[in-house]
Swiss-Prot record:
InterPro entries: Smg. The gene is smg. This is Protein Smg homolog. Belongs to the Smg family. It holds the Pfam family DUF494.
Length: 150
């Protein structure tokens, strides 16, 4: 499913091409993706869109996020560090962080690594029209140097 999401983002959403659901489904199937993964990606992205609209509510910024056991098992240490880096850099708000965590946990794979987390952050910020933040994340995604946390 994750590969379908990345393909959709790179080929359609990033370029503001938004074919209807049926056309996109046919194109993804023709590109070699499994129908179950296509449907899962559509559901995942629909949830991202609806949650993005709701995530405007501000969470307190002074708190510390304690991750559940399920989250620490699924999300790699690099993923958690990357989200902390983005939050400390004021790229992600606490509400956006929660959105990213939710969407990461909704993936069908057993572990979510740094690459997947970067893509989820990218999609979430892009979906919320955070162009400048998006550019920062895109640079972080394709720059092999990891951010230094102090």
């Amino acid at each position: 499913m994750f590969e379908v999401l990345v393909y959709m983002f790179e080929n359609y959403f990033e370029s503001d091409i938004h074919p209807d659901h049926e056309t996109l489904s046919k194109e993804l199937f023709a590109a070699g993706f499994d129908q179950e993964d296509i449907n899962g990606a559509f559901d995942w992205y629909s949830a991202l869109e609806s949650m993005s609209e709701e995530s405007d509510a501000q969470l307190g910024t002074a708190g510390i996020r304690i991750y559940s056991e399920a989250e620490t098992k699924r999300l790699s240490a690099d993923s958690l560090s990357f989200m902390m880096f983005l939050e400390q850099a004021k790229v992600l708000t606490p509400a956006q962080r929660e959105l990213v965590i939710d969407r990461a946990m909704a993936l069908s794979q057993p572990e979510v690594g740094l690459e997947e987390t970067r893509w989820i952050v990218l999609m979430a910020l892009w979906n919320q029209d955070k162009a400048n933040d998006y550019l920062f994340v895109e640079d972080a995604m394709f720059n092999d140097n990891r951010p230094t946390l102090h």
